[in-house]
């Protein structure tokens, strides 16, 4: 994949992104089946990437745009790269705004949104 193909791929609205554009401010139906956990004195979701990482130790995911991801944690490390624009994260209760070209590596069990 060359840089032009990557750029085109990243700008295509996924079905999830189309849903979020039609339902601004609403929590994705994905969360309806996930229980909330009391973790570090917070109500948050636990994400299990067992299926994503079933055959490989590393998974690559294009995160949905146009949405807010609620507080969550997982047993896997996470690397976020801001390809374009800005994104505000809450990491361990601290607001962090990232810009194009920024990289963030989260350790295991770090609550973030």
What positions do the PLM features span?
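Short beta-strand His + acidic residue motifs that chelate non-heme Fe in jelly-roll/DSBH
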Residues: 88-90, 106, 112-113
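Short, flexible loop/turn elements at secondary-structure junctions
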Residues: 81-83, 102, 110
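Short acidic-glycine-tyrosine-enriched beta hairpin
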Residues: 93-108
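Generic protein-terminus/edge-of-domain signal
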Residues: 1-87, 96
């Amino acid at each position: 994949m060359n840089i032009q193909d990557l750029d085109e791929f990243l700008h295509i609205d996924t079905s999830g992104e189309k849903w979020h554009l039609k339902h601004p401010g609403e929590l994705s139906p994905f969360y309806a089946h996930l229980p909330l956990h009391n973790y570090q004195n917070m109500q948050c979701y636990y994400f299990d990437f067992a299926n994503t990482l079933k055959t490989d130790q590393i998974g690559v995911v294009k995160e949905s745009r146009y949405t807010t991801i609620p507080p969550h944690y997982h047993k896997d490390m996470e690397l976020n790269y801001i390809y374009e624009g800005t994104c505000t994260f809450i990491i361990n209760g601290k607001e962090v705004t990232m810009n194009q070209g920024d990289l963030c590596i989260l350790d295991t069990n770090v609550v973030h949104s």
